[in-house]
């Protein structure tokens, strides 16, 4: 009847999962977070909830059919956690994980597998039965075919076993077939995406090094034929009703493509209806992607992505170090290339990955909202995510949390915790170490201040805040501080400054804080996360934690005479003033017409009182101290700010330039510090970079012109800025992301205007995202044209570029999160233009540094800071 109809709340799904999604969508409308049970994110109390007819909706089909995550590398963290709370990875442990997956609108899961047996640990089949009840589609990892895990074979194998004692399809064919067959009989009745193919045990290649490519391909073809028959016999004769997937992971990718002399598995009938799961390089950079012809494959394509990895060159497993703009850039490109059937991400232990996992799942579920047509929306997503978890807090507090999440992930993604070294960031050049140290300190201070506020005013919110924000931010930034302080200690120790010992003390305090932060996380929320912080994460010297070490700290012993050493901050210049050695330094900061402040630092090298005084300087140079005494104890260091009296300077300028000299008397002698100044008025166009310091450094988004164009097919193509992307400011990338361009025939370009003092030979160094070629042709090309002369087609990688273990060029790129390529260019005196064109997909430009040949600017992890540019 009509009256009853008006009082009905109807939730209908096309299947069980659809109905569950509807229920959870309703809970989100009520303000319930997907992490309500996983992280105890408690919703706002309401006495009543009102529904209105305008809330009625029909959900669209998800953008990606199979969306999920992989629990991996689970010891010691996830393994200890599950043992401590549930007695192991059993159904009690998986129940909250299944719920979390569904609340995130996922449907697909690879279970833990290092020492776990999902189908046995329930106990028995209880894990699988519970997954089926929840509507979770199960799969097994890239090297675990036919619904059986590697640990199962390890447990069941033996000389008297019906499955034999060798994971070898050639020597133990019948045993392996029976092992697979029994797995299909046991678990094929549940909803699965069945992994097919075969790799070696424990994530290795299936055949030895002596096997040829053809040998491997033929073996894999035999395996696939056998598995196809087994699935028909034991699951469903109609294979169109049985989703199957092969992971083209590591060496399997080569078996799929073959080479110029060996036909690979591409296009083979054994794979005609199988999902082809492509992979990243384990560090968040896509490997090959489907060509336009390949996209016709009936089975569709998947992507295996990583937020966690256990492997060469350096594992990263402790705390989230993935950055949303990078995830967006890579996964939107995957989708644009037709990878739309299956997405799965390795989340390690799950804990601390909740933030990027949410984005990954939302991107897969609703690509229209968050995908390629919505660039630069990760900040908006972050604010929305924070509101979902912490809507009870004030807008100011929510904004602080959003900043913490963005800042800590941006900073730790530049170099993951395990790969950080004291020398990663330069302790002196461009003030890099001190700049990053200050930024890390700000993040930690904000996170701790907010913790204190919540502890006082809203303790019920504290458990979720600790799990989702405080612990990952404090943990990663503290390790970053530890390595930065150690680097400062090393640098100052090398020049004999006693302040090095203070940095050593601060570094030791960070090391102590590391354990305290983890212990606080483990105690939080009634020890809910006990075990999740146990992964080693400091000073990896090998690919794994073996022989990892805390930073080496140096102690400086005081000299037995009064001694001061002077430095120019932002450089490695240092002098004592001795007449027998170099007495001169230069403050070049004021060669940038926008610079208004520089500094000199004085350091004690002795515990005896040592005096200094400025005995000469021009009137226009203003110093924050003219004399003083250091004693190596209470006063070990003094920083003297150097500024300019602009009115006095104006009287000294000739053609906008001048140079002053500071004569500083130290115990060992006179230090002479040159201070050249440029206050010229450069009347060039907006974003014209002028060489005032001997080199030019350009952030990619500061182009003088950006011209749209066309791809090879005549379709519109354009450059877009990716805000916040990369290691410094942002990046530029051409869209559509799957388009190829002819640089000499209508391609879009970005143009940079630069002014040089002299004509001659220069180097242009391009800083690029460490992308990989999207095809086996091994090309990642862009083009450069200088002053309109014939352009150069350049390649970001060499002809012999390879991805994988013991490939140093690739490894350097993924560890440093940058790839650099220098190109010789001829520049004229005065204004020059450099145009950059896309050629192949995947090229992402972050920075350009230009310098005279043979005069490269000082090195630093982030590269030289941006130099002077005209602003209109």
Where are these regions (language model features)?
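C-terminal non-catalytic alpha-helical accessory regions
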Residues: 45-47, 382-540, 740-741, 748-750, ...
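Beta-sheet-dominated interaction scaffolds and their linkers
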Residues: 537, 541-605
